[in-house]
From Swiss-Prot:
Name of this chain's protein: Acidic phospholipase A2 1
SMART domains linked to this entry: PA2c (SM00085)
One example of a Gene Ontology biological process annotation: lipid catabolic process
InterPro entries on file: PLipase_A2, PLipase_A2_Asp_AS, PLipase_A2_dom, PLipase_A2_dom_sf, PLipase_A2_His_AS
Location of this chain's protein in the cell: Secreted
EC number: 3.1.1.4
Signal peptide annotation: 1-16
Superkingdom of the source species: Eukaryota
PANTHER family noted in UniProt: PHOSPHOLIPASE A2 FAMILY MEMBER (PTHR11716), PHOSPHOLIPASE A2, MEMBRANE ASSOCIATED (PTHR11716:SF9)
Length: 138
C-alpha cells in the first residue's frame, strides 16, 4: 500500500510523463498501470535489478532500458503528445519527449500482448531480495 500511496501523491496534479503512461496503459490494457504494474516482479516500478521474472516483467525491463536512452526529456515528468488512430497509439511531434512516448507506447503494447503471463499472486510486491541475480545488459 505504501508504494501505491507514494505513486498517487507523486501523480496528483501531474499531466505529463507517468500520468500519460498510466492513461495509455488504461486505454490499451484495460487496467490501471498503478494498481497492476507499479510493484510487479523485479522491474515494474521504481528501480530494477536481477532477471525479469516473466514476459510482463520483461516489458518493464525493456521500458527501463528505453528510458535510459532518452536524452533531453525527463521520462517521469516530460509531457508528450499522442493520439489514437484506429485503436493504435500514435506519438506525435518532433520534440525530445516523443522518445518517451515511444517507450511508453511500446510498454503498453507489450503489457497487452503478454497479459497471459501476468501473475499477480506470484509477482505482485515481489521481494527485492529475490532479484539479486546479475542484470542482463540493455
Amino acid at each position: 500500500m505504501r508504494t501505491l500511496w507514494i505513486m498517487a501523491v507523486l501523480l496528483v496534479g501531474v499531466d505529463g510523463g507517468l500520468w500519460q503512461f498510466e492513461n495509455m496503459i488504461i486505454k490499451v490494457v484495460k487496467k490501471s498501470g498503478i494498481l497492476s504494474y507499479s510493484a510487479y516482479g523485479c522491474y515494474c516500478g521504481w528501480g530494477g535489478r536481477g532477471k525479469p521474472k516473466d514476459a510482463t516483467d520483461r516489458c518493464c525491463f525493456v521500458h527501463d532500458c528505453c528510458y535510459g536512452k532518452v536524452t533531453g526529456c525527463n521520462p517521469k515528468l516530460g509531457k508528450y503528445t499522442y493520439s489514437w488512430n484506429n485503436g493504435d497509439i500514435v506519438c506525435e511531434g518532433d520534440g525530445p519527449c516523443k522518445e518517451v512516448c515511444e517507450c511508453d507506447r511500446a510498454a503498453a503494447i507489450c503489457f497487452r500482448d503478454n497479459l497471459d503471463t501476468y501473475d499477480r499472486n506470484k509477482y505482485w510486491r515481489y521481494p527485492a531480495s529475490n532479484c539479486q541475480e546479475d542484470s542482463e545488459p540493455c
